[in-house]
Amino acid sequence: MTVSTRPVLGMLLKGYPRISETFISNEILLLEQLGFAVHIFSMRRGRESFTHESVARIRAGVDYLPETFLRNSYRLLYHNLCLAMRQPRRYAAGLAVARRRFMRNRNPASLRHFLQAGYLVQRCLPSSGVVHLHAHFAHSPASVALYASVLSGLPFSFTAHAKDIYTSDAAQLREKIALARFVVTCTEYNRRHLLALAAGLQTPIHRIYHGIDTRLFTNGGDFRSTASPPYHVLSVARLTEKKGIPTVLRAVKQLQERGVRLTYTLIGDGQDRAKILALVRQLGLDPVCRWLGTQPHHVVLEHYRRADLFVLGCEVAADGDRDGIPNVLFESMVMGVPVVTTALSAIPELVEPGKTGLLVPPGRPEALAEAMLKMLADAGLRQRVIPAARERVLRDFDNRALVGRLADIYRPALSGFR
């Protein structure tokens, strides 16, 4: 591998490429277009059969770290032994950090993350040209980045998103913040939470929305300012607890019982698939509900174009997991599809009730059903909300503008970057 003549930004990801993390591949592509040299370190390979088209345009090299200890013990141990012999003091310091973090919660993942970091530093870093490590997600990628920073002497930073914030051990996350050069997060709600957790620390915590590439979401100006039965209702979501799809299904059932003619299309897949499909059958929604699984971008676009309403029932999961601002809300709004969702986490930073959408309390199917019907049937509301929502996304959440703020943060970290 040829070492870049420019300082390289190392991006540490949990998996690459991942269709559910298109916002990360878009960020990398936009940074490259601004002149950044990027190298990707991924903790595992992508598991979907297709990817977003932006991935094909990314020039960054990719190194995949050994994913599991049992199947990769020789490679992990060999490269860690080489590193320990080459840099004994740094390796001893890294072991001390790993031991301290392990003793807090006895999580064996701490050892795996440390060994992955040793592999990264010994096997991957020397030929990469990387001068700064940035991890996407505050849990395992940031753990590997922290250890790699101690073992290599390179600074690290991370972007905190949603689940990685609210399901992480508070003491472990605070230590990551303390040792990082800076932290980025994607909502003001998250930033306030992290600032409280990091009280007394000097690490800068920046709020930069992900946004979307608004050029990829067009419907030819055919906005559905009026809708008529049978209404087409759409959700695009991973099938996990925090998305609140059971609440949506119960709301659809209530509307059906009230004689409202509609069809409901659900795009996405996830660990709760069996539960959700069983609930569809239990509620007798098979005649009006279609589940399509994970779909590529062009298929999702076609469903946006046909939809009269986009709905999500976001809620806090039992383990504390929650959404920030789901990217599908940006997508729906810029496509001219009005949204009804819940007043949870950072969603009100995008959706203003009566102005750019409608919000209801989480876990309330009856309230969700009422809001859905209002947005479907009230032509005046639709005529106000649809253009205002689209304008809000175009003005404040275009990722081509937002990536400039990220670039301003990364540049000082890449000493000598021009």
What kind of region is each of these model predictions?
Residues 169-171, 195, 212-229, 415:
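Acidic anion/phosphate-binding donor-loop and adjacent secondary structure
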Residues 189, 211:
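Carbohydrate-associated surface elements
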Residues 224-243, 249-252:
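Conserved donor-binding/catalytic core segment of Leloir-type glycosyltransferases
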Residues 275-298:
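Nucleotide-activated donor-binding/catalytic signature segment of Leloir-type glycosyltransferases, i.e.
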Residues 288, 367, 374, 381-408, ...:
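A short, well-ordered alpha-helix in the C-terminal region of glycosyltransferases
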Residues 305-320, 337:
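Acidic donor-binding loop of glycosyltransferase active sites
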Residues 329, 334, 338-341, 351:
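Short hydrophobic beta-strand element within catalytic cores of glycosyltransferases
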Residues 350-354, 358-365, 374-380:
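Conserved acidic donor-binding segment of nucleotide-sugar-dependent glycosyltransferases
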